[in-house]
């Protein structure tokens, strides 16, 4: 009886354990469904207006300078991040100020500190209004001259459609308000990817912000449309962001004057659904002084390319200091170009190294990636950069490379090498005797065949020495190596 009772207890315990596991799995599945609800609603662009990118296919051939960065351009979308990470978003944003309507400059400045990205052109043309603003943004611009009807929600820095959606707890509209579509190539730095978190939590954060500060939201809305109107403090963000930069706040209407603003600058961020979205950084409210006018305007300062500021010219004691040029309202993110003797202008934001050329910086940025995309065809090891793989193949697999060169009918001109003759006297003497015994044909055979060591392996010197000695042609070696890399890295 005791044994039967014990067996029954064990069976009951196993059944209870299985039921608990089944319940946990159901809870996890429900939680995941809830987390993705907002993303799925946003991906349905039928409810939020036309999306010029919705019909564009994924493009997996475009290679970012850093595979851990997220690249999206107007004609392609990529998925460099694993699917299980696509439920995350980046928390910080900037407002893209593009105010062509002078009557709405104050409203633009009020929203310039908003942590949400919008692309509101503030004109009658709806083509420049992003999916995040769709209809409400255009409707709000018609009421900018009416102080009582302006719903820009300055105290919370939340756009009208976001404020309405949050007040009504409309998750579909609220989620749509947080999504904006990119217009330029701007990769997200890898160092900012640790600050991703769930969009549902993000929107809930602004629900709380609206509910706690909904009294007097429109009390100070657009009191006067003048250049002295200052932007309110941005809405509180997560406390774990540690990137603090020294910024300047540029008011578009005060003649280009720059005011000091000690608020931390947060990088633009992306929101992910089944694809990654890249948002533009605001060039106007946050003026970055480390910008090179030579670089294209669509490249965001402080992201990939940091340029070193121009050193101030030294002045004589009897002469007043040279005036600092004021910023241009049209191109407020430009500063004078570095002097001609300042060669290293492209600076890496991760390790502070500087480079003469932008292409060199892009190649260097791959070294900061954790991904290794270049496969060695011989040992199957992986390298972060192509030049590292080329170096690896030449140094670690010299014999394999020599064999591959022979297969491609590459001529080895050992007769032109002095050091190779000194290092391999016996082999070269044998080759010379065979060449003299058979005339010109023997000489050609000796030039086309690599001498072997006693163990039967190929020529034991490295490829660089062979190229320097004139045994191998540098272009032939490069061509064979590139063909190997391409064939094994498709």
UniProtKB/Swiss-Prot annotation:
Keywords: Acetylation, Activator, Amyloid, Metal-binding, Nucleus, Prion, Repeat, Repressor, Transcription, Transcription regulation, Zinc, Zinc-finger. One of its GO terms (biological process) is negative regulation of ergosterol biosynthetic process. It is found in: Nucleus. Residues 98-295 are annotated as: Prion domain (PrD). Transcription factor that affects the expression of a large set of genes. Recognizes and binds to the consensus sequence 5'-[CAT]AGG[TC]A-3' in the promoter region. Plays a major role in the repression of a specific subset of hypoxic genes (e.g. ANB1, DAN1 and HEM13) under aerobic conditions. Acts synergistically with the transcription factor ROX1 to recruit the general repression complex SSN6-TUP1 to the promoter of hypoxic genes. Represses transcription of ergosterol biosynthetic genes. Negatively regulates pheromone-induced gene expression. Can act as a transcriptional activator (e.g. Coiled coil: none annotated. Residues 1-69, 101-162, 214-267, 421-458 are annotated as: Disordered. Residues 8-36, 119-128, 138-157, 214-232, 248-264, 421-436 have a biased composition (Low complexity). InterPro entries: Znf_C2H2_sf, Znf_C2H2_type. Gene3D superfamilies: Classic Zinc Finger (3.30.160.60). GO terms for molecular function: DNA-binding transcription factor activity, RNA polymerase II-specific; RNA polymerase II cis-regulatory region sequence-specific DNA binding; RNA polymerase II-specific DNA-binding transcription factor binding; zinc ion binding. SMART domains: ZnF_C2H2. The keyword Zinc applies. The modification N-acetylmethionine is found at residue 1. [MOT3+] is the prion form of MOT3. [MOT3+] is the result of a conformational change of the cellular MOT3 protein that becomes self-propagating and infectious. This conformational change generates a form of MOT3 that assembles into amyloid fibrils. [MOT3+]-aggregates sequester soluble MOT3, resulting in a loss-of-function phenotype for MOT3. [MOT3+] can be cured by GdnHCl and by inactivation of the molecular chaperone HSP104, which is required for [MOT3+] propagation. Present with 1690 molecules/cell in log phase SD medium. GO terms for cellular component: chromatin; cytosol; nucleus. Induction: Induced under aerobic conditions and repressed under anaerobic conditions. A zinc finger (C2H2-type) spans 346-368, 374-397. The gene is MOT3. PANTHER family: CYSTEINE AND GLYCINE-RICH PROTEIN 2 BINDING PROTEIN, IPT_TIG DOMAIN-CONTAINING PROTEIN. This is Transcriptional activator/repressor MOT3. The prion domain (PrD) is a Gln/Asn (Q/N)-rich domain, which is unstructured in its native, soluble form, and which forms a parallel in-register beta-sheet in its amyloid form.
């Amino acid at each position: 009886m005791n044994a039967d009772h014990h067996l029954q207890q064990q069976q009951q315990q196993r059944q209870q354990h299985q039921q608990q596991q089944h319940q946990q799995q159901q809870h996890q599945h429900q939680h995941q469904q809830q987390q993705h609800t907002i993303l799925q609603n946003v991906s349905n662009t039928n409810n939020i207006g036309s999306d010029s990118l919705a019909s564009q296919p994924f493009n997996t051939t475009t290679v970012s300078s850093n595979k851990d960065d997220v690249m999206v351009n107007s004609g392609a979308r990529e998925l460099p991040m694993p699917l299980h990470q696509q439920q995350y978003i980046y928390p910080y944003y900037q407002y893209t100020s593009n105010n062509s309507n002078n009557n709405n400059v104050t409203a633009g400045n009020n929203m310039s500190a908003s942590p949400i990205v919008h692309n509101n052109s503030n004109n009658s043309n709806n083509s420049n209004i992003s999916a995040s603003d769709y209809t409400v943004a255009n409707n709000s611009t018609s009421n900018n001259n009416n102080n009582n009807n302006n719903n820009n929600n300055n105290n919370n820095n939340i756009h009208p459609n976001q404020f309405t959606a949050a007040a009504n707890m409309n998750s579909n509209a609220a989620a749509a308000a947080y999504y904006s579509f990119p217009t330029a190539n701007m990769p997200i730095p890898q160092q900012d990817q640790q600050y991703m978190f769930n969009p549902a939590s993000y929107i809930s954060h602004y629900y709380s912000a609206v509910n706690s500060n909904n009294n007097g939201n429109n009390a100070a809305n657009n009191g006067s449309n003048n250049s002295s109107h200052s932007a309110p403090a941005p809405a509180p963000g997560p406390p774990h962001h540690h990137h603090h930069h020294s910024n300047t706040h540029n008011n578009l209407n005060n003649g280009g004057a720059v005011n000091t603003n000690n608020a931390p600058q947060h990088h633009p961020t992306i929101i992910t659904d089944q694809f990654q979205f890249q948002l533009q950084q605001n060039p106007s409210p946050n003026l970055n002084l480390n910008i090179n006018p030579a670089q294209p305007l669509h490249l965001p300062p402080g992201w990939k390319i940091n340029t070193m500021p121009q050193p101030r010219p030294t002045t004589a004691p009897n002469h007043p200091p040279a005036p600092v040029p004021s910023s241009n309202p049209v191109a407020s993110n430009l500063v004078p170009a570095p002097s001609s003797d300042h060669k290293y202008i492209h600076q890496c934001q991760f390790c502070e190294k500087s480079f003469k050329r932008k292409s060199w910086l892009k190649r260097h940025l791959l070294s900061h990636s954790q991904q290794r995309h270049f496969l060695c065809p011989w040992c199957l090891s992986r390298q972060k950069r192509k030049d590292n793989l080329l170096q690896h193949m030449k140094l670690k697999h010299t014999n394999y490379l020599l064999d591959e060169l022979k297969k491609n009918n590459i001529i080895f001109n050992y007769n032109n090498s002095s050091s190779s003759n000194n290092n391999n006297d016996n082999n070269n003497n044998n080759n010379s005797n065979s060449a003299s015994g058979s005339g010109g044909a023997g000489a050609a055979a000796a030039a086309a065949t690599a001498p072997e060591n006693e163990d039967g392996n190929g020529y034991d010197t490295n490829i660089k020495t062979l190229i320097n000695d004139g045994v191998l042609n540098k272009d032939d070696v490069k061509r064979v190596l590139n063909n190997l890399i391409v064939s094994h890295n498709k």
